[in-house]
From Swiss-Prot:
Keyword set, alphabetical order: Cell cycle, Cell division, Periplasm, Signal
Gene3D superfamilies tied to this protein: TolB, C-terminal domain, TolB, N-terminal domain
Function: Part of the Tol-Pal system, which plays a role in outer membrane invagination during cell division and is important for maintaining outer membrane integrity.
Protein name: Tol-Pal system protein TolB
Pfam families per the UniProt record, alphabetical: PD40, TolB_N
Database matches in SUPFAM superfamilies: TolB, N-terminal domain, Tricorn protease N-terminal domain
Locations listed in the record: Periplasm
Signal peptide: 1-25
Disulfide pairings: none
Length: 427
């Protein structure tokens, strides 16, 4: 767990001991806690699914089960064809509250169309239908979108399966910035270095990552276009350049610079131009994060004597303190709907993930671990990804915003840190 004193060392450009990942390995996910009541649903084998090179329904089932909100009702190897209304009463008698009927149609051009309908077995009604076209290589993203469809229809919240996560992993002297699907699969290295990589941050469109690299023997902020691999230096000033955070429109970054002395907040354009200082204080200001409406920037500061979370208008003005419970609260990250603020709090000497309801100001500690850091919300605000320690090495973990659903993501023989949850992938 990074203490605020250690952040001082970072901002003075001291090397951080980070954790990362191996190029070929995949994250494995273990569900360590589930919702109090799970929704029983049938996701059968799709009709004509054998025509696909790889299964799609298996991935849909895995997504929904991993969420901790659903229990899968097995009806055996028989499909429920999309073109027929199933015997909903019979499916209800098997204990299912909902059922997916789906069929695969080869298109003759190397593509496939998957048509599916979701039914409420209790009300005997159809909840919705959709058709998705895919190539053989798109089986995973298509499955994630089907799972998102089911998730949204049954919970009322957008799904988060068709998203990607970024994280830094370390194997021996090798650091890698990895990007993977939210289920840990399809991991690819965006950057490999023998020097630390920290603070990855997704652009709102999911096409770019901003991060800090020490490859030039000092912390420099880069913006990396994932589709092309092209990188651009956006902050390489005297001293430390750290903690990039994107504005909601993707046009600007808030960063922390020490070019004028102490670490202070600045805003600049995404190409590195138009640098302006946002705030001045006699303490350390760091870890900025934009509010979803773009009107505020949350940040960590010790200006009041202990590390606490503040916010400041993006147009400039007086800072307002946000956290008052405890003597150590850092790394604020707002949910996409602006309702919750996730952060790290120190509780009886343990560093844990907490959330504050920004309307009621009530704070809830979500985890029972001791060395949590780097919280990052899923796009729907339901889950929070974070880094922690397990068995003497770094792992990623996720917890629902109510604390009930818990997951652990790890890689064999590697350390993983610095997670960032990306936006929904475009069609």
């Amino acid at each position: 767990m990074k203490t605020f004193a250690q952040l001082r060392l970072l901002l003075a450009a001291a090397a951080l001991a980070l954790l990362s990942f191996s190029a070929q390995a995949q994250l494995s996910i273990e569900i360590t806690g589930a919702g109090a009541s799970r929704f029983p649903v049938i996701i059968p084998v799709f009709e004509n699914e054998a025509s696909l090179p790889r299964s799609v329904s298996d991935i849909v089932r895995a997504d929904l089960e991993r969420s901790g909100l659903f229990s899968l009702v097995d009806i055996g190897p028989l499909p429920l064809p999309e073109g027929q209304i199933p015997d909903l009463g019979s499916l209800r008698s098997r204990g299912a509250d909902a059922a997916l009927a789906a069929s695969v149609f080869p298109q003759g051009d190397g593509r496939y169309e998957i048509r599916f309908r979701l039914f409420d077995t209790q009300k005997q009604t159809e909840l919705g239908a959709l058709a998705l076209r895919m190539t053989a290589a798109q089986n995973r993203i298509t499955a994630h979108r089907i799972a998102d469809f089911v998730y949204e229809k049954l919970t009322g919240l957008p799904g988060y399966f068709a998203t990607r996560i970024a994280y830094v992993v370390k194997t021996g002297p090798r650091y890698e910035l990895q990007v993977a699907d939210a289920d840990g699969m399809n991991a690819q290295a965006a950057l490999v270095s023998r020097e630390p990589i920290i603070s990855p941050a997704w652009s709102p469109d999911g096409g770019r990552l901003a991060y800090v690299s020490f490859e030039a023997k000092k912390p420099i902020i880069y913006v990396h276009t994932l589709a092309t691999g092209q990188r651009q230096v956006v902050a390489n000033f005297k001293g430390s350049n750290s903690a990039p955070a994107w504005s909601p429109d993707g046009q600007q970054l808030s960063v922390v610079l020490t070019k004028d002395g102490l670490s202070q907040l600045y805003v600049l354009n995404a190409d590195g131009s138009g640098v302006r200082r946002l705030a001045s204080s006699s303490g350390i200001d760091t870890e900025p994060a934009w509010s979803p409406d773009g009107q505020w920037i949350y940040f960590t500061s010790d200006r009041g004597g202990s590390p606490q979370i503040y916010r400041i208008p993006t147009a400039g003005g007086a800072a307002q303190r946000v956290t008052f419970d405890g003597t150590y609260n850092v790394t604020a990250r707002p949910s996409a709907d602006g309702r919750l603020l996730a952060f790290i709090t120190r509780n009886n000497g343990r560093f844990q993930v907490a959330v504050q309801d920004l309307t009621t100001r009530q704070t809830t500690i979500l985890t029972d671990s001791a060395r949590d850091e780097s919280p990052s919300f899923a796009p729907n605000g339901r889950m929070i990804l974070y880094a922690t320690d397990a068995g003497g090495r770094g792992v990623l973990a996720a917890v629902s915003s109510d604390g009930r659903v818990k997951q652990r993501l790890s890689v064999q023989a590697a350390d993983v840190r610095e997670p960032a949850w990306g936006p929904l992938q475009k069609q």
